[in-house]
């Protein structure tokens, strides 16, 4: 990392250690070929540590969710026996039979919407209502023309998306500089733009942390608490992050309950999404079911934060279709596994 000039940009855990999760490697693999190659090798090597998915006679894999496994109330699923805990490429094995299909439904810009409506920042709510809060932010601060369309300003949109989310979790100009790989003056300028634009959110965040410190705990709408201790110095970013993530987890749990009460079969809950197993019907009825899923999930958000959140859906008719990069990595791993299996079979025959 030092040789590649990435050490200062590389994110760290709350204990100060360099992060080694797949999400971090994925982010840096887009800007550094060596990191991309290392990520690929790491995935293949670590695949040997997978304990295997617990598949029953019915073809279902079952793994514990470990609800409330994190301080924010989010799940903490196993990276060894849960396909959604393992690297994304492992999702290729997810599929269904000819009589069913899967619906992968996820909330659009969930964290940004939660920030906006918990804080009641009118500028941030306007950004959400625009349909693309990150492009709106870039336009609002004058980084792109007010009539710009996403496909023509993708680079600028991504810059302000990363900045919007990072600053929402307490990122400083120095942290933003390292995260984005830009100069400190540029990072300071972008930081000041976003803080000024969404100053109501910034004040709300400070006030809710002050209130939590005063009474000794944070609390969500439905009563999940995070107790603060005078024996431990909490990471400031954790305190800023907690209200957003904890209410995101409450939205997910509310949706899980409501979908179950509507007799939808939930296969898995993910960070900001739900995987639902549906019986194949005529196209009109399937569309009706999907529309109901989206409505239930949107309503779940409104019950928690007072505003609905839009939902995107992906239909999986046979097996999970990966993005180009992850699909390629999976094919490489699968090829190596087949060769290894063939080698073991040949060795067994020689012994016999």
Model-derived segments and spans:
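Membrane-interface starts of transmembrane alpha-helices
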Residues: 153-160, 187
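Acidic, glycine-rich two-metal-ion catalytic cores of nucleic acid-processing enzymes
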Residues: 1-151, 210-273, 290-299, 333, ...
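Short Gly/Ser/Thr- and Asp/Glu-enriched loop/turn motifs at secondary-structure junctions
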Residues: 1, 158, 191, 268-273, ...
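Extended, well-ordered alpha-helical scaffold/bundle regions in very large, multi-domain proteins
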Residues: 1-33, 169-207
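Short, amphipathic alpha-helical "recognition" segments used to contact nucleic acids or chromatin
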Residues: 158-169
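Polymerase palm active-site segment centered on the conserved acidic dipeptide of motif C
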Residues: 194-208, 281-352
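Catalytic palm subdomain of template-directed nucleic-acid polymerases
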Residues: 115-117, 172-185, 274-294
């Amino acid at each position: 990392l030092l040789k590649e000039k990435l050490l200062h940009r590389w994110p760290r855990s709350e204990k100060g250690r360099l992060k080694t999760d797949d999400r971090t490697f994925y982010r840096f693999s887009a800007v550094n070929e060596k990191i991309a190659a290392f990520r690929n090798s790491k995935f293949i090597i670590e695949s040997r540590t997978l304990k295997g998915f617990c598949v029953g006679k019915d073809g279902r894999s079952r793994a514990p969710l470990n609800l409330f496994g994190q301080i924010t109330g989010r799940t903490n699923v196993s990276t060894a026996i849960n396909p959604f805990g393992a690297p994304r490429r492992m999702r290729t094995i997810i599929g269904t039979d000819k009589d069913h299909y899967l619906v992968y439904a996820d909330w659009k810009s969930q964290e940004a919407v939660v920030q906006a409506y918990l804080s009641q920042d009118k500028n941030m709510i306007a950004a959400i209502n625009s349909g693309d809060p990150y492009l709106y932010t870039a336009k609002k601060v004058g980084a792109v023309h007010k009539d710009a369309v996403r496909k023509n300003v993708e680079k600028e949109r991504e810059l302000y998306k990363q900045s919007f989310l990072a600053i929402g979790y307490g990122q400083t100009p120095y942290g933003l500089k390292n995260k984005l790989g830009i100069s400190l003056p540029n990072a300071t300028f972008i930081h000041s733009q976003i803080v000024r634009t969404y100053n109501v959110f910034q004040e709300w965040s400070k006030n809710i942390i002050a209130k939590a410190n005063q009474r000794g705990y944070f609390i969500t709408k439905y009563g999940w608490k995070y107790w603060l201790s005078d024996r431990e110095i909490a990471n400031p970013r954790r305190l800023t992050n907690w209200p957003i993530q904890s209410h995101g987890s409450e939205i997910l749990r509310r949706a899980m309950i409501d979908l179950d009460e509507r007799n939808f079969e939930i296969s898995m809950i993910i960070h900001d999404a739900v995987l639902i197993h549906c019986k194949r019907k005529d196209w009109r009825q399937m569309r009706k079911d999907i529309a109901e899923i989206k409505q239930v999930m949107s309503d779940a958000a409104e019950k928690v934060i007072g505003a609905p959140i839009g939902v995107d859906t992906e239909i999986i008719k046979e097996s999970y279709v990966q993005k180009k990069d992850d699909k390629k990595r999976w094919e490489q791993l699968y090829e190596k596994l087949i060769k290894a299996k063939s080698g073991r079979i040949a060795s067994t025959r020689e012994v016999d």
